[in-house]
Amino acid sequence: MKTMQQRLAQATLPLVVLAALFTATHSAHAQTDRLIIENGDSALTKEQAREQKEQWDATHRLRGKVNNRVEKEFDKADRAYDNQDNCEQSLNVNAYWEPNTLRCLDRRTGRPVTP
């Protein structure tokens, strides 16, 4: 009779161990519908910060380019205005201001004149 109980115990032991493992793994599953961030520092926030920095840098470079272009166009218009003023006040009677090319030209030759 003891041998029968021993055989039964030996046969059920692996089943009990498997059941215990299944129960342990089943209860070990974590609830994944919540995100916990410790100290506000995660890969997602670092990535967002990097993307925002790249966007700010690109915007800053673009603004710099636009400002340089506006300044260049202003300087060009300012020089043209000064050149027109100098050409019209020139003592050279053959000098005239060409508004299309923004240059002071000689009436006889059509070449640029330095007023």
Swiss-Prot record:
Any coiled-coil regions, as ranges: none
Q: Keywords on this record?
A: Signal
Signal peptide range in chain numbering: 1-30
Q: Which domain of life is it from?
A: Bacteria
Q: Please indicate if the UniProt record lists Transmembrane as a keyword.
A: no
> NCBIfam families, per this entry?
PRK13659.1
Family recorded in the similarity comment: Belongs to the UPF0482 family.
Q: What is the protein's name according to its record?
A: UPF0482 protein ETA_17520
Q: Which organism is it from?
A: Erwinia tasmaniensis (strain DSM 17950 / CFBP 7177 / CIP 109463 / NCPPB 4357 / Et1/99)
